[in-house]
């Protein structure tokens, strides 16, 4: 069985960032879709998912949080680990479930969606909640792996901190 990704290991987290906020969102990671053109003009189909993400972020901050965690001018660094949902062929008998994952499967496999679109969706969802604007993000490490925990339905781990560079 593949190993779990350790977010605190030296190969994932650099010494120049000390994490102050983290979030784990269950479910298959969502990429940033491209804007679409419809009868009524241009629209962004990610609006609903973005609102759900912002609600999850606000819930972790608690009711006492007012304003953004990192105001304008504060450089931010972060780590995003996207654990992608496994396909049915990765499970014994083609039936997903806990303890049904085949042995010796790779943790990393080049699959859709693109890692940059996964990161863009998360960065945009954190706008106005964790930081004022995602232009404050000066360092970002993104890892896309296949989930190997439980039923392998996917999850996203996000850690954000002030960047000391």
Locations of regions flagged by a protein language model:
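Acidic, proline/glycine-enriched N-terminal capping motif
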Residues: 2-165
């Amino acid at each position: 069985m593949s190993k779990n990704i350790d977010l605190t290991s030296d190969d994932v987290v650099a010494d120049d960032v000390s994490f102050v906020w983290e979030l784990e969102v269950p479910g298959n990671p969502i990429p940033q879709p491209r804007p679409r053109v419809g009868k009524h003009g241009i629209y962004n189909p990610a609006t609903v998912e973005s609102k759900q993400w912002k609600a999850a972020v606000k819930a972790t901050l608690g009711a006492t949080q007012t304003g953004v965690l990192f105001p304008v001018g504060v450089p931010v660094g972060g780590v995003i680990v996207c654990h992608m949902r496994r396909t049915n062929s990765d499970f014994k008998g083609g039936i997903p479930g806990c303890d049904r994952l085949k042995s010796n499967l790779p943790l990393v496999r080049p699959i859709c969606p693109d890692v940059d679109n996964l990161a863009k969706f998360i960065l945009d969802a954190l706008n106005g909640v964790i930081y004022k604007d995602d232009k404050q993000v000066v360092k970002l490490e993104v890892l896309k792996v296949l989930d190997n925990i439980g039923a392998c339905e996917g999850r996203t781990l996000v850690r954000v901190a002030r960047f000391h560079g």
